[in-house]
């Protein structure tokens, strides 16, 4: 087949594979667009779990008629215009892919009107070339997006959708996360014509507490310790539940936002868990709602297709900052729970929102509001770091950033407070709580060893050895087999008669390890491998594995997993702080026995006493 340029619709459908995972992904992208447009009210109407209809209606600034066609085109956006903008993202969207991708796998209609226009206009794309048709329509100022029959033209994607209830639960979780990020926006969620959730916009701290309680529940609010921690351009705000009273019901409340964007960052999670570990039992997990504000130049959000992850330029600084902030408030937890006497019952989950800390360039003009006075914390659980902690000037949980850099015309006026950060898997798996930890990573020594501090002792940890144990744990099946990842291009290998016999004997065990294959007369075709092997050179690793199996007389999954773990290539020839912290977090979660009883070659204590004695003088 010759090299050729893909048709626009097919190209968009490929992009949709990363952007549009399920109906909840569509809701996330479209609501984020509404928030970037300065909307103060967003109505979300869902039918049949999003498979039949997703309608997002907002009162934002709208889209001009001449820009409607561009809005449905790939890589067309109003959020960035230069590389400088990309390196300092403060809006939720910036790639300009969502609408084009969604319209390629559904029947999408975009209706919008700006305040300057006398009439609204409607646009939709259809056909192989995704030609956009624009026609007049009736609509107030703002935008409505209707997504009908999601995945109607990609049956393979549609068959992977879950039940109506499951898909709607994912959407409900997305809106819940957005509601925690934006207290200043009213969000109404309906399903099959029935209002299910109503999060009303709020401004006052007391109302925000009620909204927090309505979203996260009264048990969380009763144990919530307020955090206000600052150092330079870093600010940490939010709530963490008192670990001494954390219950199983609270462990699913683990929400973290970076510049208003919902994140699933292992570095942040590790810092929080490490701060709480001394107060948590072996079967407990931390519960928190935290907002991290950082200079946009110091964080890269363009590292994940769905923007669920970020990369910090100074990961060690961020980790230690969060650790100290959470630890400080836990040490000052005497009588720090939030007052509940003014909390109104929330019968139908009718919570509220937060105030944006800046004027939106796209927002519809509004009457000037009275100057706001700096908010003062109502609770005694707050802690401030650095220069005493600056009070927020727009109400909780937003603060004016500690940086004032030129961002270009668009960024000077965009919302300085990020908004939603949806996410992860619908009901994201909670962090595993641990009473045991390797300790705190101080630095990387020799490129492949981490210097750790724990309970006043210093130790060196071999990162390659820890990585090998982690791989073995990931490859060893538990109560269920290891999940197999299908290969885009199956690997076909020629095998000898002895190797073929060995493969047939070990086929069931290999299947438990996530390795699936088919064999014929002289060849074997590898069709799936476990996730830890996806980035390996399978053309070298698999023949070596087959040779190993041919030399064995008996087979066991543990032995095979151990052999694979010892023979895979490390993905990190040079380790960074962030990689080391992430690795240890995974090892502590999957291999807690290594913390209690480290095997040989993993940890080596560092004798500081002899060094200190050598420095002493009579």
UniProtKB/Swiss-Prot annotation:
Task: List GO terms (cellular component aspect).
Answer: mismatch repair complex
Q: List the disulfide bonds.
A: none
Q: Which CDD domains does the entry mention? A: HATPase_MutL-MLH-PMS-like, MutL_Trans_MutL
Q: Where is the composition biased (Gly residues)?
A: 382-392
Does the record's keyword annotation contain Iron?
no
The terms under GO molecular function for this entry are: ATP binding; ATP hydrolysis activity; ATP-dependent DNA damage sensor activity; mismatched DNA binding
Q: Does the keyword Plastid apply?
A: no
Keywords of this entry: DNA damage, DNA repair
Concerning Gene3D superfamilies, the annotation shows: 3.30.230.10, Histidine kinase-like ATPase, C-terminal domain, MutL, C-terminal domain, dimerisation subdomain, MutL, C-terminal domain, regulatory subdomain
- Region annotation (Disordered) maps to 366-403
BP terms from Gene Ontology: mismatch repair
Here the segments flagged for biased composition (Low complexity) are: 366-381
- Give the family from UniProt: Belongs to the DNA mismatch repair MutL/HexB family.
Q: Main role?
A: This protein is involved in the repair of mismatches in DNA. It is required for dam-dependent methyl-directed DNA mismatch repair. May act as a 'molecular matchmaker', a protein that promotes the formation of a stable complex between two or more DNA-binding proteins in an ATP-dependent manner without itself being part of a final effector complex.
What is the name of the protein in this document? DNA mismatch repair protein MutL
Source organism of this protein record: Salmonella schwarzengrund (strain CVM19633)
UniProt lists the gene as mutL
